[in-house]
């Protein structure tokens, strides 16, 4: 059986190419945690898509490199046109510093507009190039796994091309707090793109929590235990601590060559205790802080001078960039100063290497190390910690680990956790590690070795892939609307079959169109374009003439069913030949007549004044919130307020309501995405539909039964019962439909509604997890649909 295909997309390929002739190339393995991690991914047929590490400008070079890389399962992405502005600019000078809490460089702040815009355009273009390569090689059924901040726009490009494509996105760096992330000008675009993925992964719960908070604060979406809910779509957000391939390190450390290296290094170090640091030469790795802490230790522990050494391997990453030359110079300064202070002719306390070393030599160093010192100021995971533990078979060295490294949440139980900014604390930790008893070392090592052994790369990748496939194929996403849970078991919603809608419309003799208002007949309601007051609701400008034409057809009855007040519907629809149902059908009129109250008898509304008082109290204390009032319901809306503060205020409000004005009232409370609604029991669009239909029947002489229903809306969860009201199996039985006037409710025969399955279309706007049969993306699609229906009027 063929293995499933996985397309791994990252900035760099696992190999770096070097041109050795016009048509010849050599390759070296690329450094980096992702490369190390995915070496153990064997369950999939993997194709790796990324930059080959070299610019290739000629066609022959691109062709020969592509052919050679294909033999290694790699597909090159050529970024010559945008590489500098994209990689060195937007990725490394804007995204990377913000994600690591450094902020943007001062020179960018002084020339932000020009610099940022040009680099962001390069970023978009580069992501488009990545997309083009993925599209060229994609086969149906492939899973596309996007990695890191370099390709944050890629998920959206992929989903726009093929909405059924399986797409995951994983971040290997920290994700900053929402306050830090807010400083990014393109913050919304990047978040929205990432949310189009089926699964979003992070190393730690802290990073995931920051991402969720940023989405809530900036986009105004809701977060649940499963992930982010945005207009009915749920994006799963989960935590996957990355591991290593432990057997590779364990087996390597047992090789005879490595054992010889171990003996040699021990002899070279002259019996001194070894403190090891293995880091990229980077501002976030805290190497200067490490040196200062070691200096502090030597100052306060004279007995250890000459008996302990610090070997720092600082792997160069971005040669030629000013910031990295500064950190390199700073490290060299500290090394020279400390060695001059505590060194001797025969030995120095610090050896600093500006290079990477052979893998076998690295494993040998790990194996004989007494203390691994990790002082990252911010770090994604730090796989060096796991590599060290895997190689420690005999020595059982101690891990000192920064609490700001992602590994701190995984390996903290078997390590000494430190704040790298606290020099004295790190110095004390060095002393604790060097003086630790053998039994305590064994205990800590056993804890961490067990974790590293069982949380391998293979496990990490399997977990991510299984959850990605589970989300897509098994539909185990939580199914939530923007207002409340609809419960499990909703059928998959399909895109509206426009051809069938129009064809059945043209064949029918008595059509009923039920249309919502907000988000349906208004302009598209995006989170960044939210209304501030219900009175500002206006009909989509492109609908005015089309709606008038639709309502002029004697075969068609149009009902606008909204929670809006009567005056709002009068203002927008008073000139049309249609029915208006205000406040969820509590008030009804044909535009040629007067409003009729359809409030059920014995409805108690004494609770309204008390609830209104509480709502006003919180409105005054929540900037950006507002109150919507009607005769049978009240809504407190905080969609324009700070999202986190609004949610906190909503929680407090509910406590006030339940303790006071609604404690014994016959009301329903609906907690929406960014609102709290209190209304009389039974006030939903579905429950009002019988009364509305009865009124229409009473006032309209119908020669034939209703044989076509189109119901379109952007409704709250509690109102989605309107979608199921007309399900064909329900119309087979007689319905009790209330008519107006003093007469008793009449029994109306099922001949009033004679609806077949192919003639009923329930449509949700912008939601795919809904009780409706079908969905449309936005009200723009409603405009187009109504325009096409008009061409079949009087058919």
From Swiss-Prot:
Annotated EC: 2.4.1.15
MF terms in GO: alpha,alpha-trehalose-phosphate synthase (UDP-forming) activity
GO biological-process terms attached to the record: trehalose biosynthetic process
InterPro entries found in the cross-reference section: Glyco_trans_20 (IPR001830), HAD-like_sf (IPR036412), HAD_sf (IPR023214), Trehalose_PPase (IPR003337)
Reactions it catalyzes: D-glucose 6-phosphate + UDP-alpha-D-glucose = alpha,alpha-trehalose 6-phosphate + UDP + H(+)
Region (Glycosyltransferase): 4-469
Origin superkingdom: Eukaryota
Span of the signal peptide: none
Keyword vocabulary terms for this entry: Glycosyltransferase, Transferase
Family the UniProt entry places it in: In the N-terminal section; belongs to the glycosyltransferase 20 family. In the C-terminal section; belongs to the trehalose phosphatase family.
Protein name according to UniProt: Probable alpha,alpha-trehalose-phosphate synthase [UDP-forming] 4
Gene: TPS4
């Amino acid at each position: 059986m063929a293995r499933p295909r996985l397309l791994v997309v990252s900035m760099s390929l696992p190999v770096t190419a070097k041109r050795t002739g016009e048509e010849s190339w050599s390759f070296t393995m690329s450094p980096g945690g992702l490369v190390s991690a995915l070496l153990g991914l064997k369950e999939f047929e993997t194709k790796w898509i990324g930059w080959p590490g070299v610019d290739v400008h000629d066609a022959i070079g691109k062709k020969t490199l592509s052919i050679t890389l294909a033999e290694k399962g790699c597909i090159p992405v050529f970024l010559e046109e945008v590489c500098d502005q994209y990689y060195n600019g937007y990725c490394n000078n804007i995204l990377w510093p913000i994600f690591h809490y450094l902020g943007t460089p001062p020179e960018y702040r002084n020339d932000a507009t020009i610099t940022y815009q040009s680099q962001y355009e390069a970023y978009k273009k580069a992501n488009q190039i990545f997309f083009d390569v993925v599209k060229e090689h994609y086969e149906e059924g492939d899973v596309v796994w996007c990695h890191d901040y370099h390709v944050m726009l890629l998920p959206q490009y992929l989903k726009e091309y093929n909405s059924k494509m399986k797409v995951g996105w994983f971040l290997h760096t920290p994700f900053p707090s929402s306050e830090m992330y807010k400083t990014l000008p393109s913050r919304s675009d990047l978040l929205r793109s990432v949310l189009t993925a089926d699964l979003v992964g992070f190393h730690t719960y802290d990073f995931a929590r920051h991402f969720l908070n940023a989405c809530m604060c900036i986009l105004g979406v809701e977060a649940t235990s499963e992930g982010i809910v945005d207009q009915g779509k749920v994006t799963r957000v989960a935590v996957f601590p990355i591991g290593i391939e432990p057997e590779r390190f364990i087996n390597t450390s047992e090789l005879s060559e490595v054992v010889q290296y171990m003996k040699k290094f021990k002899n070279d170090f002259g019996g001194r205790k070894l403190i090891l640091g293995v880091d990229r030469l980077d501002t976030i790795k805290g190497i200067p802080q490490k040196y200062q802490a070691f200096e502090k230790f030597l100052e306060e522990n004279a007995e250890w001078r000459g008996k302990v050494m610090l070997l720092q391997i600082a792997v160069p990453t971005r040669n030629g960039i000013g910031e990295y030359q500064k950190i390199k110079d700073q490290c060299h300064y500290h090394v020279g100063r400390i060695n001059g202070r505590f060194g001797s002719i025969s030995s120095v306390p610090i050896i600093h290497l500006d290079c990477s070393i052979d893998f076998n030599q690295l494993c040998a160093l790990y194996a004989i190390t007494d203390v691994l010192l990790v002082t990252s100021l911010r770090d994604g995971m730090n796989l060096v910690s796991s590599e060290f533990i895997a190689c420690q078979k005999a020595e059982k060295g101690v891990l000192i680990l920064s609490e700001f490294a992602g590994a701190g949440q995984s390996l903290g139980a078997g390590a000494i956790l430190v704040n790298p900014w606290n020099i004295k604390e790190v110095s004390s930790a060095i002393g604790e590690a060097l003086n630790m008893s053998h039994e305590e070392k064994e205990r800590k090592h056993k804890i961490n070795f067990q974790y590293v052994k069982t949380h391998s790369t293979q496990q990490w990748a399997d977990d991510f892939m299984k959850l990605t496939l589970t989300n897509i194929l098994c539909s185990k996403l939580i199914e939530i609307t923007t207002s409340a849970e609809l419960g499990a078991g909703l059928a998959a919603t399909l895109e509206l079959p426009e051809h069938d809608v129009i064809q059945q419309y043209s064949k029918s003799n008595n059509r009923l169109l039920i249309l919502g208002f907000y988000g349906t007949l208004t302009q598209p309601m995006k989170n960044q374009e939210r209304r501030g007051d219900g009175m500002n609701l206006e009909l989509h400008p492109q609908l005015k003439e089309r709606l008038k034409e639709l309502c002029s057809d004697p075969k068609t009855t149009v009902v606008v069913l909204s929670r809006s007040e009567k005056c709002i519907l009068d203002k927008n629809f008073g000139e049309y030949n249609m029915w208006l149902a205000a406040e969820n059908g509590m008030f009804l009129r044909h535009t040629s007549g007067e409003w009729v109250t359809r409030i059920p008898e014995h409805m108690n509304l004494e609770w309204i004044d008390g609830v209104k008082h509480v709502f006003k109290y919180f409105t005054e204390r929540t900037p950006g919130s507002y109150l919507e009032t009607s005769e049978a319901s009240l809504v407190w809306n905080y969609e324009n307020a700070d999202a986190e503060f609004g949610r906190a205020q909503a929680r407090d409000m509910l406590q006030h309501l339940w303790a006071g004005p609604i404690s014994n009232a016959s009301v329903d409370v609906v907690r929406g995405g960014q609102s709290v609604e209190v209304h009389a029991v039974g006030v939903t669009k579905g429950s009002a539909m019988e009364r509305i239909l009865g009124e229409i029947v009473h006032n309209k002489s119908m020669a034939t039964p209703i044989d076509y229903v189109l119901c379109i809306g952007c409704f709250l969860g509690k109102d989605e019962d309107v979608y199921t009201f007309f399900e064909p199996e329900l119309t087979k039985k007689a319905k009790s439909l209330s008519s107006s006037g003093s007469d008793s409710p009449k029994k109306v025969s099922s001949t009033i509604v004679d609806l077949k399955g192919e003639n009923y279309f329930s449509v949700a706007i912008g939601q795919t997890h809904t009780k409706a049969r079908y969905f449309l993306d936005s009200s723009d699609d409603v405009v187009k649909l109504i325009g096409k229906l008009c061409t079949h009027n009087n058919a």
